[in-house]
A protein has these predicted regions:
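Active-site substrate-recognition segment that forms the wall
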Residues: 57-60, 65, 69-109, 239-241, ...
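Glycine-rich FAD pyrophosphate-binding loop
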Residues: 36-55
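Rossmann-like flavin
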Residues: 100-219
Length: 426
């Protein structure tokens, strides 16, 4: 199967059997779209479905504001701010060489010029995001996305709001459409009574959606299984080794050895562990996000975003999920209660009728972040091994589109134009 990162042979032969390592949104979406193209799939995950950064995610489907994580605002925090446990962007002191490489690369890309270039590369895949969720719905996934009738970004002052308005201008300049309304605090409260009198200015984003990732991702897994896919999870499914045999791919798990025609590595913040041997040199760092749910007097009609505090609120059932924080730390680290309290403290002044002391479902998940803010999607140096990860905060939003495009590449042997900027070996 002569495919390389540099190009494709006319003799390309599509695989019949593919192993997908990772049962999060990206891995399961890739498996689903491979099945659509007639490929037999086996998914393995040592922890379980949605066990990485999927389950407690805010669940926003917001291609309109899906932007590169490295941005000039990160530099404004300064070293003192990012070392504070209460900062929304937290970097614990570390001497790890790989972590220092990540910080250096991330800082280098946190400029306006880099942001504009990366934003332009995200626009084509962003445009496919919502329509790809519709394909999954039409294909039988029983949990659906929700149209956000109100999606409000709330601020204390109009001056604070200027940052997002300027970002929207840059998003438009990159070629991405997003409709929005500029609101006063009173106008925002008329739309969403959850907002307190602290809110003096707001922006309503139009055309966005949300979902409950803890329900959606397992439903996607159920559909993959119903179509004949094999899913194994637990300690026996931990992948210990992957090797290109020259004829296929040998996948060694704690439970045994199996041969496939190709393999997809969709292991989130752990991507580098398996992908590095196949020429994926980009550092993938865990950017850990925290969330919890609280009772509210009235569940909002749509998400509420507090950009200055970097807090995301999503209605899920009869409770409100509150999420935030970007903590650059080992993905294996335990939940730090200080992060949870910092999010609650930041959100409390802006939310009316939300009991932020009655927290449940406290969670931490590791988002896979890259230094340039772009995902790693496509073939590696092995013609039979593919990578799919590094989406940062946007794995839920872009996961299905990633799976759709990567499945096309795996089956057809051609790199879709939307994926050209995201080569894992760049």
């Amino acid at each position: 199967m002569p495919v390389t990162a540099a190009g494709y042979s006319l003799a390309y032969s599509a695989p019949d059997r593919v192993a997908v390592v990772g049962a999060g949104m990206v891995g399961l979406a890739t498996a689903w779209f491979l099945q659509e193209r007639g490929v037999e799939v086996t998914i393995v995950d040592r922890a379980g479905v949605a066990a990485g950064s999927s389950w407690g995610n805010a669940g926003w489907l917001t291609p309109g504001i899906t932007t590169p994580l490295p941005e000039p605002a990160v530099l404004k925090y300064g070293v003192r701010a990012v070392l504070s446990p209460s900062s929304p962007v937290y970097v614990p002191p570390s001497a790890s060489p790989s972590f220092l490489r990540f910080v250096a690369g991330f800082t280098r890309h946190s400029t306006a010029a880099h942001w504009r270039r990366s934003m332009g590369k995200l626009v084509p895949i962003n445009r496919l995001a919502l329509e790809t969720f519709d394909l999954l719905k039409d294909g039988g996934v029983r949990v659906h996305t929700v149209e956000a009738s109100s999606f409000l970004a709330a601020y204390r002052t109009a001056d604070e709001r200027r940052t997002l308005l300027e970002e929207i201008e840059h998003i438009h300049a990159a070629g991405q459409d997003i409709e929005f309304d500029v609101l006063t605090g009173d106008e925002a409260r008329a739309i969403e009574p959850l907002l307190s009198d602290e809110v003096g200015a707001a922006i309503r984003l139009r055309g966005q959606r949300f979902l409950n990732p803890g329900a959606y991702v397992p439903a996607l897994a159920d559909e993959v299984i119903a179509r004949g896919g094999k899913l194994t999870t637990g300690p026996g499914s931990e992948v210990l080794d992957i090797a290109d045999t020259g004829r296929g791919v040998r996948v060694v798990t704690a439970g045994g050895v199996e041969e496939f025609d190709a393999a997809v590595l969709a292991t989130g913040a752990w991507l580098g562990k398996l992908a590095r041997r196949f020429g994926v040199r980009s550092v993938v760092q865990a950017g850990r996000g925290y969330s919890f749910s609280v009772p509210v007097d009235r569940v909002p009609d749509g998400p509420v975003y507090l950009p200055a505090q970097r807090v995301a609120c999503t209605p899920l059932g009869d409770r409100l999920r509150v999420a935030g924080m970007m903590e650059f730390r080992s993905p294996e680290s335990r939940l730090d209660e200080r992060r949870v309290k910092a999010i609650a403290t930041a959100a409390k002044p802006f939310l009316r009728g939300a009991d932020l002391e009655a927290r449940e479902d406290e969670w931490v998940g590791s988002r896979p972040c890259t230094t340039d803010g772009l995902p790693l999607i496509g073939v590696t140096r092995s013609p039979r091994v593919y990578a799919a990860g590094g989406h940062g905060m946007w794995g839920i939003t872009l996961g299905p589109a990633t799976g759709r495009l990567l499945a096309d590449q795996i089956v057809n042997g051609r790199v879709p134009a939307e994926l050209e900027p995201f080569s894992p070996t760049r």
